[in-house]
Design a protein with these regions (language model features):
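PLP-dependent enzyme catalytic core of the Aspartate aminotransferase-like
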Residues: 159-160, 344-353, 359-394
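Helix C-cap/helix->beta junction micro-motif
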Residues: 29, 134, 196-197, 313, ...
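Conserved core segment of the aminotransferase class I/II
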Residues: 229-300, 309, 391-392
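N-terminal small-domain helix-loop-helix segment of the aminotransferase-like
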Residues: 2-98, 105, 157, 284-287, ...
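Active-site phosphate-binding strand-loop segment of PLP-dependent enzymes
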Residues: 139, 143-217
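A short helix-loop-beta submotif of the ANL/AMP-binding
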Residues: 133-139
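Conserved glycine-rich beta-strand-loop-beta hairpin in the small C-terminal domain of fold type I
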Residues: 282, 298-307, 317-330
Length: 394
């Protein structure tokens, strides 16, 4: 009782998330919310029907700790079907409360205090918090846009980030918030360094089915590279692929000893999750290829719609190769700071975005960049673009 702030020191840098702040702004001002990455449509009807059936037929109690067998089998089948990866559903897959818990449980399971985690910035903000909760230290490697607008890391900077306390590399591809899809050469360098330094990899691949047809490279799971399956925990979720972000159903796949470690931690975080929703996600994972390609094509059209509208409104646009998000530079509109720009945007034109600098340790690298989500209905995007054009008019 000797301090006025009861929060532990390692968590004091983390306030209310930018998503909560900007979503509250949207509600308060009636703005179009393009800040947070959630769709405004529901997922495939087969999945919704399966969830309703599960609710009606007694799937409302605790599911098994690792997840129901049907979902674990569906995850294994999905990874075999799309990526040629073989996982034993009875020991190499665990179901989690979304990818956020999967990342947190993986880091908590593998990192001792003082261990170092290499991550690529800008990064999803929960990564930094999960690393801090473990008492570990993050070592960011900055992705920078080239002349073509595509982000990339400096291989020398990545090599320099490895050291005697490096425990794991946290890799997100397709990448939030930049929309970057890591190339085979980039992944090969990551894999070589992981093997050389004998470290683990945790890969967040929730946008695995949102790689657009004009991307410079297809999505390649790091676990498919030589020597990486045995040291990689691969994470994905239903939220982004099936437009059900509120369900919070994710999974971790990997070698049995690593997955067992994650499960040991997960059981003391949420214990189990989403009993009646797990059978529905199992159904969704078995949908035909046409669902996955159609979903991608639909989201790509929305990307094109919003990117063109942002350019017309006067932003500098860094077109993404995947994900839900497009990065925009506020400099052409006279902006100097993304946080200030985003806080004023709802009043100026009735649209909400999020400042990208909050995803960086190197704040200057993202100071003039902001992120918009395009996973919204076309008419919502059209209204947002109409409002954003007021910025240029003014």
């Amino acid at each position: 009782m000797t301090t006025t702030d009861p929060l532990v020191a390692r968590m004091r840098p983390f306030g209310t998330t930018v998503f909560a702040e900007m979503s509250a702004l949207a509600v308060r001002t009636g703005a179009v919310n393009l800040g947070q990455g959630f769709p405004d449509t529901d997922g495939p009807p087969e999945m919704l029907a399966a969830a309703a059936e599960a609710l009606r037929t007694g799937h409302n109690q605790y599911p098994p700790g690792p997840g129901i067998p049907a979902l674990r089998a569906a995850v294994a089948g999905h990874q075999r079907r799309f990526w040629g990866l073989e996982y034993d559903p009875d020991g190499e897959i665990v179901v989690t409360a979304g990818a956020t818990e999967a990342v947190a449980a993986s880091i908590l399971a593998l990192c001792e205090p003082g261990d170092e985690v290499i991550c690529f910035e800008p990064y999803y903000d929960s990564y930094a918090a999960s690393i801090a909760l473990a008492g570990a230290v993050r070592r960011p490697v900055t992705l920078r846009p080239g002349a073509d607008g595509r982000y990339a890391y400096d291989p020398d900077e990545l090599r320099a980030a490895f050291g005697p306390r490096t425990r794991l590399v946290l890799l997100n591809s397709p990448h939030n918030p930049t929309g970057r899809v890591f190339t085979a050469d980039e992944l090969t360098t990551v894999a070589e360094l992981c093997r050389e330094h004998d470290v683990y990899a945790v890969t967040d691949e929730v946008y695995e089915h949102l790689v657009f047809t004009d991307a410079a490279a297809p999505h390649v799971p790091l676990a498919t590279l030589p020597g990486m399956r045995e040291r990689t925990l691969r994470i994905s979720s239903a939220g982004k692929t099936f437009s059900c972000t509120g369900w919070k159903v994710g999974w971790v796949s990997g070698p049995a000893p690593l997955v067992a470690a994650v499960l040991r931690v997960k059981q003391f975080l949420t214990f189990v999750n989403a009993g009646p929703l797990q059978p529905a996600v199992a159904v969704a994972l078995g949908l035909p290829d046409a669902y996955f390609t159609g979903f991608r094509d639909d989201i790509q059209r929305r990307r094109d719609q919003l990117a063109a509208g942002l350019a017309d409104a006067g932003f500098g646009v860094l077109a993404p190769e995947g994900t839900y998000f497009v990065t925009a530079d506020v400099t052409p509109l006279g902006g100097r700071d993304g946080v200030e720009f985003c806080r004023a945007l709802p009043q100026r034109c009735g649209v909400v975005a999020v400042p990208t600098q909050v995803f960086y340790d190197d704040v200057e690298a993202g100071r003039r960049l902001i992120r918009f989500a395009f996973c919204k209905r076309p008419e919502v995007l059209a209204e947002a673009v109409t409002r954003l054009r007021r910025l240029r008019a003014n």
